[in-house]
Design a protein with these regions (language model features):
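Alpha/beta-hydrolase fold catalytic core
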Residues: 2-78, 102-104, 324-325
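Conserved serine/cysteine hydrolase catalytic core
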Residues: 223-299
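Conserved HGGG/HGGXW glycine-rich cap/lid loop of the alpha/beta-hydrolase fold
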Residues: 66, 72-116
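Conserved hydrolase catalytic core segment
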Residues: 144-186
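Catalytic active-site module of serine/aspartate enzymes centered on a nucleophile-bearing elbow/loop
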Residues: 293-325
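Short beta-to-alpha linker loops that shape the active-site pocket of alpha/beta-hydrolase fold enzymes
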Residues: 110-115, 178, 301-304
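Flexible "cap/lid" loop of the alpha/beta hydrolase fold
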Residues: 173-205
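Active-site loop/oxyanion-hole signature of alpha/beta-hydrolase fold enzymes
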Residues: 111-147
Length: 325
């Protein structure tokens, strides 16, 4: 009898446990909200100082409702335009632009929302991005035709640009660009990538990037990108990347619509792929080069995705080859 009484008094009561769990959860939520609020205020104040501490190296150009950052150096013709990959900006081309500007006119820019550029309208599809690039080059007064150089996701943008404005395209250099035919894999990865970028945006928005400056900086980042990490990889850039990721299936479909036999005619084209690619990726690279009668497929010795940083001489040589016509 005593044992039963003891059991009744010591047995955990479900309602009591539930109330304790709810109180703990509520406390955790309150603490998270408070911490986020403090971080948000801290980040907002610090972000206002970025314009002074991390000024844009180029100029802001109005493209109809928002302004994009354009950075042009050097002189010569044709002008080389550098297009960055997903979650990257003009800073990812620092090494190439610095060296190339000694002999050519070269322009890098930030797509809407990235780094020093203002946010743009949605959806952020390849067609919209190519249209904004065209508007930027037109409004800036940078004369074409242009040698379009793209890395990764940036390939979507320049391929749509070349299809729509063929007369303004002097040539293409495509550095390990995205495969628009991998729609099944893209449909699976699209929401996962968007969630990851949403987390990155939150980390930047509540000031954690400033507390740990390398939190969102990829290992391949250039010295300039690292020095300006709070702008280059800040919450605005992460939001822009997320918007592009959400539209990536539509972008791939738009790019695929430009593919047809001899689509690029006799346009000078170089497709650069890293070493160690899968057969599927290699087949895509070969198919791109075959779209032009003057298409050239080059395999780097590096296995790195950022070939322009791992082997800048290779990329510079191919840009010069295409620019020479």
């Amino acid at each position: 009898m005593a044992d039963r009484k003891l059991e009744r008094t010591t047995r955990p009561r479900p309602r009591r446990l539930l109330r304790a769990l709810l109180r703990a959860t509520a406390l955790a939520v309150v603490l998270l909200v408070l911490a986020s609020g403090v971080g948000f205020a801290y980040e907002s104040n610090a972000a206002r100082a970025d314009a002074r501490e991390h000024p844009a190296p180029g100029r802001l150009v109005d493209v109809g409702g928002h302004r994009l950052h354009l950075y042009c150096t050097g002189s010569g013709s044709p002008t080389v335009v550098l297009e960055a990959g997903l979650a990257e900006s003009s800073a990812s081309w620092e090494v190439i632009q610095r060296r190339l500007s000694a002999r050519s006119r070269v322009c890098s820019y930030d797509r809407a929302g990235y780094a020093w550029s203002q946010e743009g309208p949605s959806p952020r599809t390849a067609e919209r991005l190519a249209g904004e690039l065209h508007a930027l080059l037109t409004a800036s007064g940078e004369a074409g035709p242009y040698v379009m150089v793209a890395h990764s996701f940036g390939g979507n943008v320049v391929r749509v640009f070349a299809d729509r404005w063929r007369s303004l395209t002097a040539g293409l250099v495509l550095v390990d660009v995205t495969d628009e035919t991998a729609l099944t894999a893209l449909r699976i990865s699209q929401p996962l990538l968007a969630v990851q970028l949403s987390v990155n945006q939150f980390v930047a928005r509540v000031g954690l990037l400033r507390l740990r400056g390398d939190a969102l900086v990829p290992p391949e980042a250039t010295p300039f990108a690292r020095a300006n990490a709070t702008v280059v990889y800040g919450s605005g850039s992460m939001a822009a990347a997320r918007a592009e990721a959400w539209a990536s299936v539509d972008s791939a479909t738009q790019v695929a619509a430009t593919v047809r036999p001899h689509a690029w005619g006799d346009l000078p084209v170089t497709v650069i792929r890293p070493a160690g690619q899968s057969e599927e990726d290699s087949a895509h690279a070969r198919s791109l080069a075959a779209l032009s009668s003057r298409g050239r497929l080059v395999t780097a010795t590096t296995t790195e995705h950022y070939v322009q940083n791992a082997q800048p001489d290779l990329v510079l040589d191919e840009i010069a080859r295409v620019a020479a016509g």
